[in-house]
Amino acid sequence: MSGAAAIAVGGKLGFAKTYAEPQQTATTAAADLAFINGRIHTMDSNNRIVSQALIRNGRFAAVGDNILGQAANVKRVNLMGKTVIPGIIDAHNHIVLVGNRPGWHTPLEHVFTIADAIAQLKSRSAEVPRGEFITTIGPISAMQFVERRLPNLSELDAVDRPVYIQAAQGGTRMNSAGKAWLEARGVMVGADGAITGPALGLALQTLRKELLTPDTRKRTALGALQYYSRLGITTHRDCGAFQADDPAPGIASENTYTMHNPFLALHREEKLPARMRIDFLHQDPPTANPSLPTLSQRLRNSFPFFGDDWMRTGGIGEFTGGGVEGLRAIAKAGWRGEDHALNLAGVTNLIKDRETVNAEIPITQLRWIISHIPEFPVELANRANALGIGVLVGWGPLRTGMNVGPPYRMLMGHAIKKGYHSDGGDITVINPWLNFYTIITGQNLAGQPILGEQNLTRQETLWLATAANKWFIWENDIGSIEVGNHGDLVVLDRDYFSVPDEDLKRMRSLVTIVGGKVVHNDGIV
């Protein structure tokens, strides 16, 4: 199939058919595409805004104004003044966990009222065979709804399929059909459809045991990538899961040796609608004489940065494991390593350990990463920068409290490498627009101030999620709309740079292009 010539102004983005069954292709085949009459924010070093961009053979062949002339054999897309940005790069999330959820997984990160959530689930039920589960597990929070709660049992009973919702914040809710299904398998569910205590882990474990197959995993993996394509993400850097050989009760656990299989299958079939970069999480214990049983095997038997433009391995993270000895092994192997920090003591220790290793084995060229950093004073930024370490920030829409960081404004004035990540998939949201909302306004999804004076402008926020993330992906040909770069772009449904703050949360893609392929379109005729 091929793209067509014009975008219909005012088209509504449809999320009803969120996860379709895998079709023959997940993308429209690459063709020469000329985008004209737009406001194309290139995010190049000069922050140029141009009206035209030509994609040929999957890469930008021309970018500017009046560049096309009488070019032949090109499909022209009239943007009619729409805003275009480079494809969003989420430089640290857990998309692979989302792609391995049981049931007919249905994201709800784009709805903000209980009524809209129920409408979404009811629409989804039309695609789901009778008696099969609709699930929403992970990237959803009570905070995102104006009611500040999850749907209750009576509300979910409007959906004529079993429903299971497990939120990053707000607990777990089911409807009567889902409640009866789990209770028949020995899982205790409250009269209100809530699950608490040990029963919560047992519920998820039971769903995984009974509902997951290679085919359902593949369906969900494709659906997850398609969903976030509709939100403008063109590159995901996945940062792993906690290892579990058997179906696990924990939301952040999976078999880390097989969980990539559905994504690899999509890659083999050329159905990936987004680029994937895969890091490997390890947790070998830091003992006096560690054997590093899993990390040593990974470093010995895997290749870093191996693959193609659609799927490629990366490094070790979001945990390196093995303490200082693990860091030494990673440095000796020449791999990238990443750990997260949740407080000042944690990030201080991470930097101290890296200084110890760097004194023995230089790491300054390995682009090591520390993520999250809610507390990160200038002195630590100086020390991290001296080691060649970059920091990933985001991770905030569901947080509460005053001045809980990260210190975005300080970082923008510092030489240290910085980029955007959501960390979404299990404990927070992936939706970039919810994360951007917090970075720009300084408020969480409940409208509570959490950043003090550390919030950023819209231009700065977009830069973190596009051009700045080249360094973290270790690729120079994504993240900006420039000649020679991969043809990744997003046509937005509204102008990101001028809409009211509250509308930021509702931003969507009308058209998402990856490598010249149309991976999402709404309104192309």
Identify the role of each PLM range.
Residues 16, 20-22:
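Boundary at the C-terminal end of the N-terminal hydrophobic targeting segment
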Residues 3-6, 10, 22-36, 41, ...:
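Divalent metal-binding segments
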Residues 10-16:
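Membrane-interface motif at the C-terminal end of an N-terminal transmembrane signal
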Residues 499-501:
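Residues that cap or delimit alpha-helices
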Residues 304-306, 384-388:
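Structural alpha-helical segments in enzyme catalytic/regulatory domains
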Residues 522-525:
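Glycine- and charge-enriched low-complexity intrinsically disordered segments
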Residues 331, 336, 340, 345-368, ...:
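His/Asp/Glu-enriched, well-ordered alpha-helical/loop segment
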